[in-house]
């Protein structure tokens, strides 16, 4: 019996290589927005519904992470309560404005909104309302997928059309693009794993820019390294907001 592991690795690495070749300037542009916000007293907010919330969590309160990141994580848009709940709710109007108000997002801030398809009401509305506030918007999405589907928002537009910067995760239409041999089954979704890579790359570039400009960014250490708790508690108390 043959294994699919090597073929899947090749499939995944093709997408990762494409992202490496095409997304550097978007990462740099996004990092400039975030670093400027930080130096001017702003914050970096991150939001994703469904599985995309994992990317928001990846850079929130994380070892090596910027303490000025705030993840917007409404439990009703995650998967731990009922799997289909977020699917239904992210198509409803009016939620995004409440989330932004609850987290006190301002015109000093940058928000990254993550949606693989970029078509559903909540992420599109989140981008519109963020822009209305005056915050800068970074979209993380799949351009291959988003450009192949219609919007579910009343504007007829998708997330990337309201963004100042677009990070393209390179995922194929439908996300799960690896075909199981001798079948019509597609699996191996990549949007979250590549998305986490892009999110970490954005943080790394942001920290690079801040240090270059003489700004000492507050960065967490791993809580599982001896002696880190006291350091992290100080950082947390001074900078973390939720």
UniProtKB/Swiss-Prot annotation:
GO terms classed as biological process: carbohydrate derivative metabolic process
Cross-referenced Pfam families: SIS_2
SIS domain location: 34-217
Q: Which InterPro entries match?
A: RpiR-like_SIS (IPR035472), SIS_dom (IPR001347), SIS_dom_sf (IPR046348), SIS_GmhA/DiaA_subfam (IPR050099), UPF0309 (IPR022951)
Question: PANTHER family of this UniProt entry?
Answer: PHOSPHOHEPTOSE ISOMERASE (PTHR30390:SF7), SEDOHEPTULOSE 7-PHOSPHATE ISOMERASE / DNAA INITIATOR-ASSOCIATING FACTOR FOR REPLICATION INITIATION (PTHR30390)
User: NCBIfam families per the record?
Assistant: PRK02947.1
Source organism:
Halalkalibacterium halodurans (strain ATCC BAA-125 / DSM 18197 / FERM 7344 / JCM 9153 / C-125) (Bacillus halodurans)
Alphabetized GO MF terms: carbohydrate derivative binding
* Protein name as catalogued: UPF0309 protein BH3325
Q: Origin, by domain of life?
A: Bacteria
